[in-house]
Amino acid sequence: MLSSKDEFIKHMVIEVQNTTVVSASGEAKKLGQYSENVILIVNVASYCGNTAQYKDLQKLHDIYSKKGLRILAFPCNDFGNQEPDSLTEIKNFCSTKYGVEFEIMEKVHAKGNTTEPYTTLNNVEPKGDVEWNFEKFLIGKDSNVIARFKPSIQPFDENLIAAIEVALDS
């Protein structure tokens, strides 16, 4: 059992760092492999009212990837059956419609019987399942979750941009 807040924080950093995710090509990766980068994790869907966020996520990638931002998009069909397509179809849709160049990962479950990275992320404060498609988790270079942003928060929301810039400068 952990006895102090400091131990708990260290424990959570280790858990997030050691969280295994799977790329669209089937390659298992630990989030810690992205250390020295700031990561924005987003659960995505092709048939959602928030799908247009892909465009601004790509703009974020264009602006901040050279500074160390990595965007990891996890297709998710948990909300209204809004991502029923195969990974090949999803990647094709993202690249042709929105010019997406950031990483598309394997499909996941972000609520209920979750799969990684959401089994871990949903336990970080504020605890609970992802509410809908395009919820965002910002992870710092130290593999610690910095912030969680609701699906309604657009990629160029001033609070999200400020958090990204502070994380990149740390």
Give residue spans per PLM region:
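Acidic-and-aromatic substrate-binding clefts and catalytic sites of carbohydrate-active enzymes
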Residues: 48-51, 79-82, 155
